[in-house]
């Protein structure tokens, strides 16, 4: 499935200008049909999955309780 720059911006929660600049820099693969750029949606699948995994990992770390009895010997 192909998306326009506007649809890609909505899908990725990024601005249209930023998406367009990434396309023009060649950082996002796109096809130009004469009128608009068309971007293959599946190229973002792995990235978005990794982003969700990272968010879950960060949340897990933040929710981990701090031990009540920290056995630290201060030798100062």
From Swiss-Prot:
Pfam families recorded for this chain?
HTH_17 (PF12728)
UniProt GO molecular function: DNA binding
Record InterPro entries: HTH_17 (IPR041657), SinI_DNA-bd (IPR010093), Tn1545/Tn916_Xis (IPR038148)
What protein name applies here? Uncharacterized protein YoeD
């Amino acid at each position: 499935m192909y998306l326009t720059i506007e649809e890609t911006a909505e899908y990725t929660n990024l601005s249209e200008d930023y998406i367009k600049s990434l396309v023009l820099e060649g950082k996002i693969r796109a096809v130009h049909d004469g009128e608009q750029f068309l971007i293959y949606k599946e190229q973002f699948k792995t990235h978005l999955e990794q982003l969700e995994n990272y968010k879950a990992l960060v949340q897990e770390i933040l929710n981990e309780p701090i031990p009540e009895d920290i056995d630290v010997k201060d030798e100062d």
